[in-house]
């Protein structure tokens, strides 16, 4: 028999969460229908206004500023990662990974060579670096920097590393399954457990086999770090295939959200959240809103949401970079995955997904979902985290990880600053390169980077201006 959340005993916060969530879903549906009816006329008007505004501003800017503006617009309008990389003179090889449970993941190999050369394995056997994105994202977030000097991926390619970008099941590049269609409920029946059990280890095995290497360096951002922690904790042999885990804005057990009402909503029982959002993709209309709204308005809406949910100001990210980044920020994932994160916030522990069949807090003293045994990880871990990041509880993270973890704090950085701030080239890329040099012999033709010598363990020395 199906249990409906409104006939269960709920706390008053959960009744409020149910009411607000129901109101939000209905309001968003009505607004979507209205917007769809006027999309062809008003949407085109919005975009023409923005284009004219960009043209006017570009005439008033200096030549260098105008080039940045044109580059920002080109990246903003790029349809996929291949177009985005081509703007900066890089090329993309697409590779398909079949997971053990039959999802087809599209991953990308970034190169400065022409697309005609598909060198697998690479004749020089370059050190392999595998980068993985965060929640509700895809591989594009790594290459949408307006200033290419702030792009970690491009810098690694320039330094002679064999760079691969992963994608989670369900996102823009990984919506295929051998038995299910993306419109099927079964396709979206996955959580962080499945990323850890299948996506990460199967992708790593493919990359190592294709590159001819026995080990790689894993660089994760946000949920990409949590997936690695979880996967390494439940796959002991995977630890022998990763020489170092570099975690940018690492996430294991966020404290919660800045807005108390929304925080109560997200910590509600899964039955409530599934009742409101269904059991497929979370907010499938987000792509429509992005295409409908003027870029500046879409940027303002997202900035407001980030401020309300996480208390982020995005002060370290330029206005151009924010417009570009937000255009490539969202990608699909399952409602179940988001529910899993809400369960982690609710328990304040990095646990496996809980189906919540028992339904009441009373039973929690008899039953809890298993914790990921992250203390068992043998791979060397290097954390780079922001002092103003509301999603990072560094002490809780250090308690959950092995004692040998090294970490670097960037004082004023928020979560998204780790990949998009104007000073990534000063405060993120140098410690990453230093860590890689500690692991590998310098690749052929690598230039000395004086910046790395200014990096000290657990500290980054400011250059010219404080962080």
UniProtKB/Swiss-Prot annotation:
SUPFAM superfamilies: alpha/beta-Hydrolases. Glycans are attached at residues 311, 316. This is Probable lipase C1672.09. GO terms for cellular component: cytoplasm; membrane. Gene3D superfamilies: alpha/beta hydrolase (3.40.50.1820). Residues 127-421 form the AB hydrolase-1 domain. The chain crosses the membrane at residues 18-38. Residues 39-467 are lumenal. It is a single-pass type II membrane protein. Its main location: cytoplasm. Its EC number is 3.1.1.-. GO terms for molecular function: sterol ester esterase activity. It comes from Schizosaccharomyces pombe (strain 972 / ATCC 24843) (Fission yeast). The modification Phosphoserine is found at residue 66. GO terms for biological process: ergosterol metabolic process; lipid catabolic process; sterol metabolic process. Pfam families: Abhydrolase_1. Residues 440-467 are annotated as: Disordered. The keyword Protease does not apply. The keyword Oxidoreductase does not apply. It is an enzyme of class 3 (hydrolase). Residues 440-457 have a biased composition (Basic and acidic residues). The active site is at 222 (nucleophile), 389 (charge relay system), 415 (charge relay system). Belongs to the AB hydrolase superfamily. Lipase family. Probable lipase. InterPro entries: AB_hydrolase_1 (IPR000073), AB_hydrolase_fold (IPR029058). It is found in: Cytoplasm; Membrane. Keywords: Cytoplasm, Glycoprotein, Hydrolase, Lipid degradation, Lipid metabolism, Membrane, Phosphoprotein, Signal-anchor, Transmembrane, Transmembrane helix.
């Amino acid at each position: 028999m199906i249990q409906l959340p409104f006939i269960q005993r709920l706390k008053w916060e959960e009744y409020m969460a149910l009411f607000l969530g129901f109101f939000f879903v209905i309001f968003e549906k009505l607004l979507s229908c209205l917007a769809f009816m006027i999309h062809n006329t008003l949407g085109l008007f919005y975009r023409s206004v923005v284009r004219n505004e960009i043209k006017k501003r570009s005439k008033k800017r200096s030549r260098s500023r105008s080039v940045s503006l044109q580059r920002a617009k080109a990246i903003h309008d790029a349809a996929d990662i291949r177009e985005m990389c081509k703007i900066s003179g890089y090329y993309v090889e697409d590779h398909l990974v079949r997971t053990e449970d039959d999802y087809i993941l599209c991953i990308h190999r970034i190169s400065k060579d022409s697309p005609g050369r598909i060198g697998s394995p690479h004749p020089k056997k370059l050190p392999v670096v595998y980068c993985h994105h965060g929640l509700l994202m895809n591989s594009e977030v790594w290459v949408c920097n307006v200033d290419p000097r702030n792009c970690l991926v491009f810098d690694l390619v320039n330094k002679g590393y064999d760079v691969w970008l992963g994608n989670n099941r369900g996102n823009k590049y990984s919506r295929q399954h051998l038995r299910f269609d993306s419109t099927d409920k079964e396709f979206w029946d996955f959580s962080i457990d499945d990323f850890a059990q299948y996506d990460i280890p199967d992708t790593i095995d493919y990359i190592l086999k294709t590159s001819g290497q026995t080990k790689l360096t894993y660089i994760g951002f946000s949920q990409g770090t949590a997936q690695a922690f979880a996967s390494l904790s439940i796959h002991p042999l995977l630890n022998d295939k990763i020489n170092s885990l570099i975690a940018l804005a690492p996430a294991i057990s966020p404290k919660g959200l800045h807005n108390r009402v929304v925080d109560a909503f997200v910590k509600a029982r899964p039955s409530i959240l599934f009742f409101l959002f269904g059991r497929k993709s979370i907010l499938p209309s987000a792509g429509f809103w992005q295409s409908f709204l003027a870029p500046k308005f879409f940027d303002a809406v997202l900035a407001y949401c980030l401020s309300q949910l996480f208390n982020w100001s995005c002060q370290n990210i330029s206005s151009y970079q924010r417009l570009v980044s937000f255009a490539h920020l969202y990608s699909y994932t399952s409602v179940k995955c988001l529910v899993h994160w809400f369960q982690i916030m609710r328990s304040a522990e990095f646990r496996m997904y809980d189906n919540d069949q028992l339904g009441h807090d009373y039973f929690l003293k008899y039953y809890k979902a298993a914790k990921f045994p992250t203390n068992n990880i043998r791979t060397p871990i290097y954390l780079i985290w922001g002092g103003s990041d509301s999603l990072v509880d560094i002490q809780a993270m250090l308690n959950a990880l092995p004692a040998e973890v090294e970490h670097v704090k960037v004082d004023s950085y928020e979560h998204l600053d780790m990949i998009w701030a104007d000073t990534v080239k000063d405060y993120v890329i140098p410690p990453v390169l230093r860590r890689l040099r500690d692991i590998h012999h310098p690749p052929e033709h690598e230039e000395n980077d004086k910046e790395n010598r200014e990096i000290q363990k657990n500290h980054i020395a400011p250059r010219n201006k404080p962080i």
